[in-house]
Design a protein with these regions (language model features):
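Conserved donor-binding loop and adjoining core beta-sheet/short helix segment
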Residues: 35-106, 227-255
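Short catalytic-loop micro-motif centered on adjacent basic/acidic residues
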Residues: 98-100, 167, 277-280
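Conserved active-site alpha-helix within GNAT-family acetyltransferase domains
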Residues: 106-123, 152, 284-301
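Acyltransferase donor/substrate-recognition loop-hinge adjacent to the catalytic core
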Residues: 116-197
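Short, conserved active-site entrance elements at the starts or edges of catalytic domains
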Residues: 171-231
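Aromatic (often tryptophan-rich) hydrophobic motifs at membrane interfaces
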Residues: 220-310
Length: 310
């Protein structure tokens, strides 16, 4: 990063725990859990997120390998002027203006905004980064030939752990570092024993989880752990990202127990009866994860577009 870029970036502020209030007005417009306030704060040290307000538009920089932009805006926001300012800033720093986490439904908006300042856009999306979306009724359904795999997995799980149970994290300000949260860390430790840090290409997920707990919001988040007796087996964390969608943002089945991942997702949905869609996130191009997520029959995959302004 050159001196000009460093000078420019001083205008932007690191995302901290106290910034939640600045992001809240945009929560109902969230398309992806990757870029809610909680996700940005949790992954802050890995992606060096920084933000700045441009009128009623919140601009977040993601600084991993290249600098890119995530836009937060409301219905009716006029981003023409914002795009013009960003384009000039990036041009001055000899950088290409690139937006990430753009939904397909937003492409025309970005196209029209770019044209309003005399520019064009190009865009692309990777299957590796696309989120798997499930209609909750279909995800819970065990009937029919297509759901045979779900039934086989659950039957295998019940034979191995007939007394399997689930516990939900009941948050208060005094128990953030004990109770089932410690069991989540234990499951992480088990998972780490069979993986190397070099394979965690986005950084240490356990440390990301620690930061997430700092901003846990009981109104938006649910943490559940599965147990065989007193032994923790797996855990999952869901985040409500809009009025009808919950997204699984952390999930670990350290012992790779057959049927357990689906069972825990299913039990959490059965306790949350006003959700229409479940987002299980991306597969990162890992074939085993792709096979598992397809086996639950997604209703569609939600692409995350990268938009470049030229």
């Amino acid at each position: 990063m050159n001196d000009l870029e460093l000078l420019w970036l001083k205008e932007f502020k690191e995302v901290t725990a106290s910034d939640e209030k600045n992001f809240k007005p945009y929560m109902e417009y969230s398309e992806f859990a990757d870029c809610t306030f909680y996700g940005l704060y949790a992954w802050q040290r890995n992606f060096q997120y920084a933000y700045k307000m441009y009128g009623d538009v919140l601009v977040v920089l993601e600084i991993k390998k290249d600098i890119s932009v995530i836009l937060f805006y409301k219905n009716g926001s006029d981003i023409f002027g914002v795009m013009q300012q960003l384009y000039e800033l990036f041009k001055e720093a000899d950088l290409s203006l690139t937006f990430r986490y753009v939904a397909k439904s937003q492409l025309d908006f970005y196209k029209n905004s770019a044209e309003a300042i005399g520019k064009t856009i190009s865009y692309s999306a990777s299957a590796d980064d696309s989120d798997y979306i499930y209609e909750v009724g279909d995800f819970l359904c065990l009937d029919g030939k297509k759901n045979k795999g779900k039934r086989i997995g659950l039957n295998s799980l019940y034979r191995m752990y007939p007394e399997i149970s689930i516990k939900k994290y009941e948050y208060n300000k005094n128990n953030g570092k004990n109770g089932i949260i410690e069991d989540c860390y234990h499951i992480f430790d088990q998972w780490c024993e069979s993986h190397t840090c070099e394979n965690c290409v986005y950084g240490c997920e356990k440390e990301v989880f620690r930061r997430f707990i700092e901003v846990f919001d009981i109104a938006r988040h649910e943490i559940c752990v599965s147990y065989a007796g007193e032994k923790p087996l797996s855990f999952a964390v869901n985040e409500r990202i809009n009025e009808d969608t919950t997204c699984c943002i952390f999930q670990k089945n350290a012992s790779r127990i057959r049927g357990l991942t689906y069972w825990l997702n299913r039990e959490m949905l059965l306790q949350d009866n006003d959700v229409r869609y479940l987002n299980l996130g991306e597969d990162m191009g890992i074939n085993g994860i792709r096979i598992d997520k397809n086996s639950f029959h997604p209703c569609y995959k939600k692409e995350k577009y990268v938009v470049k302004v030229q």
